Structure formats: C-alpha cells, structure tokens
Amino acid sequence: MFRKVLVANRGVAAVRIADTLKRLGVLSIGLRTTEERGNKYFERFDEVYDLAGDSVSETYLDIDQILEIANLANAEAVHPGYGFLSEN
C-alpha cells in the first residue's frame, strides 16, 4: 500500500479521493492554483502545493510540473482523478 499519494485533480473529485485516502490511512497531497487558494476543501488534504501558471494547460495538465511536485513531496503515487491527466 502507498503511504503518500498526490491527487492531480481539483474540486469534488479531489476531495472524494482525499477522503478515501484518509480512510485507508494514506497521506494525501493536493494541488491548487492561485485562484483556488481560498477554497476550504484544501483543508481535507495533508499537504497542499501551489501550481504555477494561469490556464489549465499550465497547471493541471502540466505533467512535468506535477511530477516535480510529486518528487518534492516524496509522493509514492499520483492519482489522476477524473478528466485532466486521466484523459491524457
């Protein structure tokens, strides 16, 4: 079982994944854009990292940036969620 997973998604999908990881005893890592900083749902994650960029293609679809954050956070896996990375 993984001990720490980066969730490469946002909104309801990301929260559901984070909640499931918590029930499994796995630490969750969330990603957010500058616009999303005030959203309360990020409190559901064990760690949160900011994505650089303005558009979806510069943030949630930037695979290199997401993998860089995963390495920085010592994530053992990346969950793509629904849409975004799961479609690429």
Predicted regions and their residues:
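ATP-binding N-terminal substructure of ATP-dependent carboxylate-amine bond-forming enzymes
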Residues: 1-88
